[in-house]
Amino acid sequence: MALLFIGIDPSTGGGNCPAVWVDQPEGAGAEPELVLQGWLADAAMLERCAQDSPRPDTEAVIRIPARMVKQIREACDVVERSQL
């Protein structure tokens, strides 16, 4: 696993904040993935999200502030460049 740190919530003063990485696995057929750290969704949000996409036990719903769009776009760009 080659984990590339992209950035944290720009309005934070330090640790314990939403963050974005790209996992760039090595090996044939391995595809990169976005790795996101965010706030856990509350029960009401989980219930609403389940209406559109039921969540298995192996997944989590998190919240990430919209001010992190730049970091998420950068992570997406890294993934796209790796697939050229």
Residue ranges and their predicted role:
Residues M1-G7:
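Short Pro/Gly-enriched beta-strand edge/turn motifs at strand-loop
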Residues I8-T12:
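Short Gly/Pro-enriched turn/cap motifs at secondary-structure boundaries
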Residues G14-E59:
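A short, structured beta-strand/loop element
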Residues G38, E47-L84:
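Helix-rich interaction surfaces within compact, conserved domain-sized segments
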